[in-house]
Amino acid sequence: MKKYLEVQENNTKDTVLCEMIRFQTDRGLDKKDFNIDDELLNIIEEMLEAKGVRDKDNREFSKIVLDSFNSFVSYVSMYEKDYYSEPTDHTEVDAFCDIVEYATGGILKKGYNPVIALDEMAKEINSRIGTFRNGKFTKDKSIEAQAKWYKANFTKARLQN
């Protein structure tokens, strides 16, 4: 399996990362001010989806989870000071890198090549057009737009045992 991953990574890893960055830059997302809660809201929405909870329209479920999370952090910062330090750029970037690392592990444990899976996801995301509303991308669901949608084929990423 290691050899298989090395071959695949050498062929596509730069392309996959570039496609993920392109999604952000084409839509001007990289120009928005950084807001940790907005970023965490996106991650929470995906975590809920992984558990079967759909929260696509108004993000209310994600907001409830984020509010609970923030209440916990506030409690720790006030009453458990030994376990809290003010976040820095370094700790935030480190945390996001760790999230990517754990997500990569999850994809591998499910039996998929993360590079190919991410490539498929990038193709799907970049095939969509739409608008942003409240910080969330809303797909154009017109017949013309749907005709251009690519559906990720994760079977291409399935690892051979």
Describe the predicted segments one by one.
Residues 1-96, 100-161:
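Flexible "arm" and connector segments at domain edges
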